[in-house]
Amino acid sequence: MSALTRLVPFGRVGGRLLRGCRARAAGDSGVRHAGGGVHIQPRYREFPQLTRSQVIQGEFLSSLMWFWILWRFWHDSDAVLGHFSYPDPSQWTDEELGIPPDDED
């Protein structure tokens, strides 16, 4: 008996779906909830009115973003500047630098 009582909600949902399909087939679309309510008016060339919650959320997300960028730059700057160390210029030869030998006139 308890198995049948668990199936009762599914029967109710199925009945509602069938009634909705029959109503659409008969041309009766039911209640339309799309019009007549309060709408946000468009604001041409004006800033939108933000709520305090939206301002706080925006500040929090932008702070989190900049914290992450600066943290990663500070702790892993090779990702931005490159992975290879700059060679020591004192070990370069004159030939590599394009300087002609001293004995050549």
Curated annotation (Swiss-Prot):
Keyword line: Electron transport, Membrane, Mitochondrion, Mitochondrion inner membrane, Respiratory chain, Transit peptide, Transport
Write down a Pfam family by its short name.
Answer: NADH_B2
What is its subcellular localisation?
Answer: Mitochondrion inner membrane
GO biological process entries: aerobic respiration; proton motive force-driven mitochondrial ATP synthesis
Q: Which InterPro entries match?
A: NDUFB2_animal
Region annotation (Disordered) maps to: 86-105
One Gene Ontology cellular component = respiratory chain complex I
Biased composition, Acidic residues: where in the chain?
Answer: 93-105
Q: Which superkingdom does the taxonomy of this entry point to?
A: Eukaryota
Chief place where the protein resides: mitochondrion
Q: How does it sit in the membrane?
A: Peripheral membrane protein
What is the extent of the transit peptide?
1-33
Reported function = Accessory subunit of the mitochondrial membrane respiratory chain NADH dehydrogenase (Complex I), that is believed not to be involved in catalysis. Complex I functions in the transfer of electrons from NADH to the respiratory chain. The immediate electron acceptor for the enzyme is believed to be ubiquinone.
Q: Give the family per the record.
A: Belongs to the complex I NDUFB2 subunit family.
Instruction: Cite the record's note on assembly.
Output: Complex I is composed of 45 different subunits.
What's the protein called, per UniProt?
NADH dehydrogenase [ubiquinone] 1 beta subcomplex subunit 2, mitochondrial
Q: Which organism is it from?
A: Mus musculus
